[in-house]
From Swiss-Prot:
Protein name: Small ribosomal subunit protein bS20
GO terms for MF: small ribosomal subunit rRNA binding; structural constituent of ribosome
Alphabetic keyword roster: Ribonucleoprotein, Ribosomal protein, RNA-binding, rRNA-binding
Organism: Geobacter metallireducens (strain ATCC 53774 / DSM 7210 / GS-15)
Encoding gene, per UniProt annotation: rpsT
Entry's Gene Ontology cellular component terms: cytosol; small ribosomal subunit
Length: 87
């Protein structure tokens, strides 16, 4: 266990950030899953709608440092390509 006051504070801060990051990452996965499920159901309208909802969430996660910027870009690209296969 930490002995310094600053180290104890950092432990508390890290715990708070961990919960926040976990929540954001979980929500991110849910949005991505919604897009994939809509594509599997061959529902083009729902897939496009889900993609439009997912892109800002992915970008925000990258901005906050939850995921790497390149990972966010890759996710958006792959999901967009997937939705475009429906026509």
């Amino acid at each position: 266990m930490a002995h310094h006051k600053s180290a104890l504070k950092r432990i508390k801060q890290n715990k708070r950030k961990q919960f926040r990051n976990k929540s954001i990452r979980s929500g991110l996965r849910t949005f991505i899953k919604n897009v994939r499920e809509a594509v599997e159901a061959k529902d083009a309208a729902k897939a496009k709608e889900a993609l439009q909802a997912a892109i800002p969430v992915i970008d925000k996660a990258a901005t906050k440092g939850i995921i790497h910027a390149n990972a966010a870009s890759r996710n958006v690209s792959r999901l967009t390509k997937l939705v475009n296969t429906l026509g």
